[in-house]
Swiss-Prot record:
Top-rank taxon: Eukaryota
Organism per entry: Bitis gabonica (Gaboon adder)
Cellular component, GO annotation: extracellular region
Name this polypeptide is given: Zinc metalloproteinase/disintegrin
Cofactor annotation comment: Binds 1 zinc ion per subunit.
Segments forming domain Peptidase M12B: 46-242
Reported cofactor(s): Zn(2+)
Record-listed Zn(2+) binding positions: H182, H186, H192
Motif (Cell attachment site): 300-302
Subunit record text: Heterodimer of bitisgabonin and gabonin-1 (bitisgabonin-1) or gabonin-2 (bitisgabonin-2); disulfide-linked.
EC identifiers of the protein: 3.4.24.-
Other remarks in the entry: The disintegrin belongs to the dimeric disintegrin subfamily.
Keywords: Cell adhesion impairing toxin, Disulfide bond, Hemostasis impairing toxin, Hydrolase, Metal-binding, Metalloprotease, Protease, Pyrrolidone carboxylic acid, Secreted, Toxin, Zinc, Zymogen
A GO term for molecular function: metal ion binding
Length: 325
């Protein structure tokens, strides 16, 4: 939901995104395509050390299985790296925090208030425990209206304002990652795309609404706004490449956030080999997509089984689940 609030000269702007559609099943590009394009040569390399905080509802959503939560967060982080590649930005997971016992702030459906509280908590507590550039709160709380995310515009590297909140609104990791990328885009000075903005698709990352067949690329407008943010603010923190000791890892295959040996990867670059389909995901086995119709998520309650499409490593949502609810 679009929101642009200013209270005096010091109050930061806030912008969000609304969710209006079903998820698409288009496969995201492989990690081997991430870096080295001519487009990203327009930007100097930047490194964002990110902390993702999962609220208590996220832990309960996964039946208290912290490994499952951690896996989900890394899947989101991997997708973020793909989306920010054209800007020559590498996302490094500086930390994962899971509120396993209770929420450490009062998470409300009022997105602006939750964002404010999360920013204050980050400044007071999180920065004292772990150095990082940005923090995103992932919550199961239904944010007000159609809002699924909110962030401060231009807040990157500010102790209180380098934050965003994202509702865990989809069972497909890249859809949630697209919302988180949108909020990170706001933190990097990007506004919502107007009708004149183009990324080669109907909807870009900074579109005000998540529409059907959403693109996972930033528009020409977003790239210019990002360049303006860099010129005006010169954020020094995101110039430094983080040490490996400052990152967290997970046994999930395909962790492009930190190099790790894997049979699908080139042993030198740890990028997927050219002839392989995938390196991770519930629909990836032996570096290949599983056959269409393979069950990847067993039915629960009145939900139907979800199946692999044969075109993606993701476990796509069964459309019958949406038609019947």
């Amino acid at each position: 939901k679009y929101e642009n609030v200013e209270k005096g000269d010091e109050a930061p702007k806030k912008c969000g995104v609304t969710h209006t559609n079903l998820e698409s099943d288009e496969p995201i590009e492989k990690a081997s395509q991430l870096f080295g394009t001519s487009e990203q040569q327009r930007f100097d390399p930047r490194h964002i050390e990110l902390v993702i905080v999962a609220d208590h509802g996220m832990v309960m959503k996964h039946n208290g299985d912290l490994t499952a939560v951690r896996t989900w967060l890394h899947q989101i982080g991997n997708n973020l790296n793909v989306m920010f590649a054209d800007l020559n930005i590498r996302i490094t997971m500086a930390g994962l925090e899971m509120w396993s016992e209770k929420d450490l702030i009062d998470i409300q459906s009022a997105a602006s208030e939750t964002l404010r509280l999360f920013g204050e908590w980050r400044e007071r507590y999180l920065l004292n425990r772990r150095m990082h550039d940005n923090a995103q709160l992932l919550t199961t709380v239904n944010l007000d209206g159609d809002t699924v995310g909110l962030a401060y515009v231009g807040g990157m590297c500010d102790p209180k304002n380098s934050v965003g909140i994202v509702q865990d609104h989809s069972r497909i990791a890249r859809e949630v990652a697209a919302t988180m990328a949108h909020e990170l885009g706001h933190n990097l000075g990007m506004a919502h795309d107007g009708n004149q903005c183009n990324c080669g698709a109907n909807g870009c990352v900074m579109s005000e609404e998540i529409i059907e067949r959403t693109s996972y690329q930033f528009s020409d407008c977003s790239k210019e706004e990002y360049r303006t943010f860099l010129d005006n603010h010169n954020p020094q923190r995101i110039l430094n490449e983080p040490l490996r000791t400052d990152t967290v890892s997970t046994p999930v295959y395909g962790n492009v956030l930190q190099n790790s040996p894997h049979p699908c990867c080139d042993p030198v670059t740890c990028k997927p080999k050219a002839w392989e389909h995938c390196i991770s995901g519930p629909c990836c086995r032996d570096c290949k997509f599983l056959r269409p119709g393979t069950v990847c998520r067993v039915a629960r309650g009145d939900w139907n089984d979800d199946f692999c499409t044969g075109r993606s490593s993701e476990c796509e949502s069964n459309p019958w689940n949406f038609w019947n609810h």
